[in-house]
Amino acid sequence: MTQQPKIPRATAKRLPIYFRYLTFLHDAGKERISSSELSEAIKFDAATIRRDFSYFGALGKRGYGYDVKALLDFFANVLDQDSLINVALIGAGNLGQALLNFNFHQSSNMRIAAAFDADEKRTGTILSGVPIYSMEELQEQITAQRINIAILTVPQGVAQEITNQLVETGVKGILNFTPVRVTVPTGVRVQNVDLTNELQTLVYFIENYGSITTGL
């Protein structure tokens, strides 16, 4: 993957959405699309889409719009879709098992390659094709499988401790489903996913603004 320009975090979060919809358009046989058509489909305003795309140079032509195949190929490169990305899942409880069952079915280049849990009843088993290892095997397996991204779905009381272990193994990115805001050193990125917060935010918007669709 070629080096990409620095872009705002909000733009980066929209890139997979663009890629997913462009994949849908390409599979449907559509050859070109305008920013206004794209806006209507994915519910981001056209100005935001044009601004996002402008960070990468001239991706479209005035009066023509965007070539779907060219744009799809471009974002596939930006998102490194040609490389298989192995991900570790830490915590194979209810949420962890749901993620294992899903295992990125909408993405061809990401997969949960290994899961880890402290419960001896779960370790040594295979769930949805993914082996579940003990926590004692964490460093060995992450190193052997060259994993640098982990999903954290553990009890909040051990979230920081396990985060420290992940950092020691060389993990560079953590998708954190726990309510704890874990601390990591420079060079490690954490993305927090708090379902309770998301639902509370949704309720707030519904009660105060109605059911207006909002983008990222």
Swiss-Prot record:
Q: Name one GO cellular component term.
A: cytoplasm
Record has Thylakoid as a keyword: no
Q: Which InterPro entries does the record cross-reference, listed alphabetically?
A: CoA-bd, NAD(P)-bd_dom_sf, Rex_DNA-bd_C_dom, Tscrpt_rep_Rex, WH-like_DNA-bd_sf, WH_DNA-bd_sf
Example of a GO MF term: DNA binding
**Protein purpose:** Modulates transcription in response to changes in cellular NADH/NAD(+) redox state.
Name the family. Belongs to the transcriptional regulatory Rex family.
**Protein name, per record:** Redox-sensing transcriptional repressor Rex
Organism of derivation: Leuconostoc mesenteroides subsp. mesenteroides (strain ATCC 8293 / DSM 20343 / BCRC 11652 / CCM 1803 / JCM 6124 / NCDO 523 / NBRC 100496 / NCIMB 8023 / NCTC 12954 / NRRL B-1118 / 37Y)
